[in-house]
C-alpha cells in the first residue's frame, strides 16, 4: 500500500484537518466511543493488536491513518518571506525532539523548520505523533548542506542566531524582532563548527539552577516565543 502512516488521536485529527489526503483510517471500537469526531470520519474498525502491528508501536491510542506522503517545503522560499521566523536544527536525531520543536514552532507562528538531509530526524509517524499533528500545518524543509544554506540566505533581512551555552549575548539582549533563523544543535554535541561559524550571533539562555543545559526542544520553545514576544511588543 502507498502512503505513510500517522497514529495517535491528535496527530490523526490534524491530518484530517491538514493538507494531506487521508487514504484510509482505522480505529478500535473503544476509540470510536471515546472520540466523537472519529464517527464523522467514517473509519474502519480493527482490533487493537492489528493496529499495533500496523503502526509498529502500541502508542497509537486506537487510531491509525494512512495518508499521502509528506510534502516538504522549499527552504529558500521560506527564507525569502517577509520577516521570516525559522527554527533550524543541526544533528537533532531524536524524532521526539523534532516533533516537540515542530509543535512549539507552529504554536509560535514560525515560518517553518529547516533540517539537514543527513544525520537528522525527518518527518516520520513518530515525529507526527510527538508534534501532536503540528507537522500537518507547519512547513518543514530539508537542505543538503546546512552551513552553506545559512550562508546563502542570511543578510540584512535575515539574521542567523545560534543557540550556544557559552555565548555572552543572552536571549534577553538579542534583537529577535526582525527576520531571524534560530539554529539549535543536538543537546550533547551542540552546533557543528561550520554551522556555528555561519551564525551572525551566538545567544545563550540564562540558567538559574545547577543544570548546564536544556533539552533542545525546550531551548527552541524559549527562543521562539521570545522572538514572538519581541515581534508583538
Predicted regions and their residues:
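Short basic, glycine-rich beta-strand/loop surfaces that mediate nucleic-acid
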Residues: 58-68, 131-135, 177-185
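Active-site/ligand-binding-proximal alpha/beta "capping" segment
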Residues: 161-211, 215
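RNA substrate-binding interface of SAM-dependent RNA methyltransferases
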Residues: 27, 81-169, 173
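Short, ordered loop/turn segments at secondary-structure junctions
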Residues: 30-31, 48-50, 118-120, 166, ...
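N-terminal positively charged helical leader segments and presequences
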Residues: 1-80
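Structured adenosyl-cofactor binding patch, chiefly the S-adenosyl-L-methionine
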Residues: 13, 18-19, 107, 129-134, ...
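Active-site helix-initiating loop/hinge in glycosyltransferases
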Residues: 8, 90, 97, 213-215
